[in-house]
């Protein structure tokens, strides 16, 4: 009798664990598909395999609300129902319930695997960690920047690099090259028309979101070095390094005597961004740095760290100081308010649209426009070039895609127009900007393009996998097509490994 009670207790305990686990798992899959780009398994794999400390502070509360608390509520209701049935003397078999909950758990696990296409992760991990092979693609198309003659201009121009989180050219109107009836980013659209904007046609446009370039860490690496993110980090003696044998925009400008600063409102170690940026010439100012130097309160934290409103104010102060030096400067910025899935609504944001992300984008457009106007009013602006780029396209979740929901175009038409935003303001007068339209390009091409916009002369116009868009020479996408390039850059190659 005693043994039977112990057995029943253990069966009920196991049954409850399986029920709670299954409910939480089912709801967590739904939550993940509403908040993360689970269809982009390569992105998810690479981000999770890097340093994820410093993540969005709202993720935990979102998880609480999205599946932890609801699953607990479901479990409590489940136990109440069992209690009522027991009070009514309805026989409840622990063994039968354990079997039912085991079937429930198996069904949830199988459904989760199917919905998340989870088999892709071990397959891709095997590919990433497999034996590297020699790549004919790299041999034919990679131009070693260390062997390219780069002639700096006699008078070096300052550079302000603004990487805007998830900024796309598709946020413009349909008639201007975007996908919406109303322009979400009217200021950036107007400024793009008035300045240099590289595009696949005569309208406002941008670059292809290739594999290995389509999330923040990958966007920064690919735009600054001309190579993709394919497990670029290596750890030696406890230190993390990133593409030590690749030349970056920061390395080139550092060698030309520039002062380099890169600012962000989040923590620099997320995705090992510090290893990349600091390893290639930049002094990184992140939320920790700004707290230590009194820019923000020690205990202040919202969203990923602090909002863009404060970042732009800090940038104005830092640019004013950098401009006092006799050396040219390169000041990089990474905004964050427009991060998926819904962005961060600061005090400046208005409710112009039904979707919160669209309101945050409109607010970001207004803030960067005010910052551009401030720069134009400074004494140093005449010798300063501003390059604005989306770090990547918006990472929509399978069950949360405001672009598809709010655009009048078909899904196919939308996908054809989705490109990361690019804008060059006040480039060197010595360059030829006639080639800015009817170009198919990617993040790789921004490295040599930005350098030439500063007045540098690049022999052949090629650096790494990038081709300057100021040249008539074809980019990789123009030469091979997007599908072929994606296939080749997602192979583990000996040539890429040699850059680590």
Predicted region positions:
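Generic intrinsically disordered, low-complexity segments enriched for polar/acidic and small residues
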Residues: 38, 42, 101, 118-121, ...
């Amino acid at each position: 009798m005693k043994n039977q009670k112990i057995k029943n207790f253990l069966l009920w305990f196991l049954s409850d664990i399986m029920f709670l686990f299954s409910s939480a798992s089912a709801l967590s899959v739904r939550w993940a598909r509403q908040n993360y780009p689970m269809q982009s398994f390569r992105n998810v794999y690479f981000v999770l395999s890097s340093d994820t400390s410093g993540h969005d502070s709202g993720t935990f509360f979102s998880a609480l609300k999205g599946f932890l608390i609801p699953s607990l509520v479901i479990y409590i209701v489940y136990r109440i129902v069992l209690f009522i049935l027991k009070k009514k003397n309805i026989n409840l078999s622990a063994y039968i319930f354990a079997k039912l909950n085991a079937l429930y758990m198996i069904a949830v696990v199988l459904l989760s695997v199917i919905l998340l296409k989870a088999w892709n992760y071990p397959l891709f991990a095997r590919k990433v960690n497999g034996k590297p092979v020699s790549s004919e693609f790299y041999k034919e198309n990679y131009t070693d920047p260390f062997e390219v003659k780069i002639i700096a201009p006699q008078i070096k121009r300052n550079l302000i690099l603004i990487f805007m989180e998830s900024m796309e050219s598709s946020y413009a109107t349909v008639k201007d090259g975007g996908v919406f009836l109303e322009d979400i980013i009217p200021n950036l659209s107007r400024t793009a028309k008035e300045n240099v904007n590289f595009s696949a046609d005569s309208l406002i446009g941008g670059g292809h979101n290739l594999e290995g370039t389509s999330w923040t860490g990958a966007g920064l690496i690919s735009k600054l070095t001309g190579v993709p993110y394919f497990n670029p980090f290596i750890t030696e003696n406890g230190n993390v390094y990133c593409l030590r044998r690749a030349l970056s925009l920061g390395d080139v400008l550092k060698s030309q005597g520039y002062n380099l600063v890169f600012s962000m409102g989040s923590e620099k170690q997320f995705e090992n961004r510090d290893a990349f940026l600091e390893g290639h010439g930049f002094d990184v100012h992140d939320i920790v740095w700004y707290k230590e130097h009194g820019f923000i309160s020690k205990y202040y934290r919202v969203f990923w760290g602090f909002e863009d409103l404060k970042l732009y104010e800090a940038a104005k102060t830092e640019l004013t100081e950098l401009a006092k030096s006799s050396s040219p400067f390169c000041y990089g910025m990474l905004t964050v308010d427009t991060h998926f899935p819904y962005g961060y609504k600061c005090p400046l944001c208005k409710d112009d649209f039904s979707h919160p992300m669209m309101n945050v984008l409109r607010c970001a457009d207004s803030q960067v426009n005010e910052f551009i106007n401030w720069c134009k009013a400074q004494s140093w602006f005449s010798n300063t070039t501003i390059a604005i780029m989306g770090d990547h396209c918006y990472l929509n979740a399978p069950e949360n895609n405001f672009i598809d929901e709010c655009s009048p175009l078909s899904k196919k038409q939308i996908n054809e127009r989705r490109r990361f935003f690019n804008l060059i303001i006040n480039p060197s007068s010595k360059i030829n900007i006639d080639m800015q339209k009817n170009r198919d390009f990617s993040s790789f091409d921004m490295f040599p393009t930005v350098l030439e916009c500063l007045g540098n002369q690049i022999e052949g116009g090629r650096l790494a996998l990038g081709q300057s868009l100021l040249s008539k020479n074809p980019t990789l996408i123009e030469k091979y097509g997007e599908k072929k390039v994606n296939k080749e850059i997602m192979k583990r190659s000996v040539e890429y490994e040699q850059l680590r």
